[in-house]
Amino acid sequence: MTAAAEPTAVPVAPPLQVAIYDDVVAARGEQFRIPGLAVTVFAHADDAVAQCLTAGYDVVFMDYALGPGRRVGTEVTRALRAAGFRGKVVAISSDPAANAAIRAAGADSSLAQKALLRSYLVHLGRAPLNP
């Protein structure tokens, strides 16, 4: 009698760590439970540099206007890059000019419409992150 072969465990990649800095998404209480991603939503980005460097986020989605008296997305993106953050930054303002400003401050890309955020996240969860 031949012993059955033990199933080989397939290594599972850890989920991508994703931060979303958007006051409206946070106010709506939106939650993103997407396979392959661990998503955290923040209402403002005042502490984004410390949060991103400590938590090791792979991807950061950054809005421009994050509420009265709060740091704006361009300032935060510039500070992230100056602090050595090497993850991807994606601008998610509904205003194309604001997205362009965030890109000029160091973001890698932008979403044309914030309404596409969930679809983009689903795609990101399915595809490996390119270096």
Model region roles, listed by residue range:
Residues 41-59, 63-67:
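Acidic, metal-coordinating helix/loop segments flanking the phosphotransfer/catalytic sites
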Residues 1-34, 38, 115-131:
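Non-catalytic signal-transmission and effector/linker regions of two-component phosphorelay proteins
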Residues 90-92:
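Hydrophobic/aromatic residues positioned on beta-strands within the core alpha/beta folds
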